[in-house]
């Protein structure tokens, strides 16, 4: 079954947008994944195609109505057999581990909010998982949805040209990615580190690991704090590996 993302939005014309070019775009054109953008207004019941109303209790802005959004969700995912997400700054932070889980499934239904937000009752009634891509606020969920979809698509079979390209990137091993270099060998007096030109794969791997660890310690202490537990588990598992028995 082809991985497929369905997006509920007030602006379906925003899609595929950046997802239609480069790596994701080529994969989309090749049928390695699918995308459907549905207009929430199609589920409105009045002649004005109204989808929002004023906040209960007062306050600025407008709120997406639960009845309209529920109808939109039910129209495309009545069986509720895949993840249902809503992009929200108050949601759980999106991690590479969660991206891998989503990429391994059938593809999510993603709700993109606008205005002041979404009626909480539809979030509860339809089991929407609130997901955040960062501690900041966007005008709507569409750009956040594109980021999530792009992160998933690059993990799908056949999308990346080389398997190691995805497994060596930031977060795939709990570390930020090491620095990358290419020609020219010297740029404005700054040379490529000699070890990368040595041809010694062991030394190159050790250098890259050291750089990744140093960057993670300095820039993401939260990731580094979780690293020792992963290392201890890995060592424990290696110690449990049975030794080869000799005949006789």
From Swiss-Prot:
Cellular component, GO annotation: cytosol
Gene3D superfamilies per record: 3.40.1280.10, tRNA(m1g37)methyltransferase, domain 2 (1.10.1270.20)
Catalytic activity: guanosine(37) in tRNA + S-adenosyl-L-methionine = N(1)-methylguanosine(37) in tRNA + S-adenosyl-L-homocysteine + H(+)
Positions annotated to bind S-adenosyl-L-methionine: 113, 133-138
SUPFAM superfamilies from the UniProt entry: alpha/beta knot
Bias-annotated ranges (Basic and acidic residues): 234-248
Assigned keywords, A-Z: Cytoplasm, Methyltransferase, S-adenosyl-L-methionine, Transferase, tRNA processing
Annotated EC: 2.1.1.228
Region (Disordered): 226-248
GO-annotated molecular function: tRNA (guanine(37)-N1)-methyltransferase activity
Top-level taxonomic group: Bacteria
InterPro entries attached to this UniProt entry: Alpha/beta_knot_MTases (IPR029028), tRNA_m1G_MeTrfase_C_sf (IPR023148), tRNA_m1G_MeTrfase_TrmD (IPR002649), tRNA_m1G_MTases_N (IPR029026), tRNA_MeTrfase_TRMD/TRM10 (IPR016009)
Subcellular location: Cytoplasm
Function description: Specifically methylates guanosine-37 in various tRNAs.
Quaternary context: Homodimer.
NCBIfam families: PRK00026.1, trmD
Family assignment from sequence similarity: Belongs to the RNA methyltransferase TrmD family.
Protein name: tRNA (guanine-N(1)-)-methyltransferase
Protein's organism: Rhodopseudomonas palustris (strain ATCC BAA-98 / CGA009)
């Amino acid at each position: 079954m082809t991985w497929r993302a369905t997006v509920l939005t007030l602006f379906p014309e925003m899609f595929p947008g950046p997802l239609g070019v480069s790596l994701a775009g080529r994969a989309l054109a090749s049928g390695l994944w699918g995308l459907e953008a549905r207009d929430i207004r199609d589920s409105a019941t009045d002649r004005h195609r109204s989808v929002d109303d004023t906040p209960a209790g007062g306050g600025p802005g407008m709120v997406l109505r639960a009845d309209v959004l529920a109808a939109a969700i039910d129209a495309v995912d009545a069986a509720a057999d895949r993840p249902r997400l809503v992009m929200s700054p108050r949601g759980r932070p999106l991690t590479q581990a969660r991206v891998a889980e989503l990429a391994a499934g059938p593809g999510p239904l993603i709700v993109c909010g606008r205005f002041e937000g979404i009626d909480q009752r539809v979030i509860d009634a339809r089991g929407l998982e609130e997901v955040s891509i960062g501690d900041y606020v966007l005008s709507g969920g569409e750009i956040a949805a594109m980021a999530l979809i792009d992160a998933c698509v690059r993990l799908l079979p056949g999308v990346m040209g080389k398997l190691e390209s995805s497994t060596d990137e930031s977060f795939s091993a709990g570390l930020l990615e090491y620095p990358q270099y290419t020609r020219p060998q010297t740029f404005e007096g700054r040379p490529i580190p000699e070890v990368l030109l040595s041809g010694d794969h062991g030394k190159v791997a050790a250098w890259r690991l050291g750089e990744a660890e140093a960057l993670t310690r300095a820039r993401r202490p939260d990731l580094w704090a979780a690293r020792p537990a992963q290392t201890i588990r890995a060592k424990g598992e290696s110690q449990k590996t049975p030794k080869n028995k000799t005949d006789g």
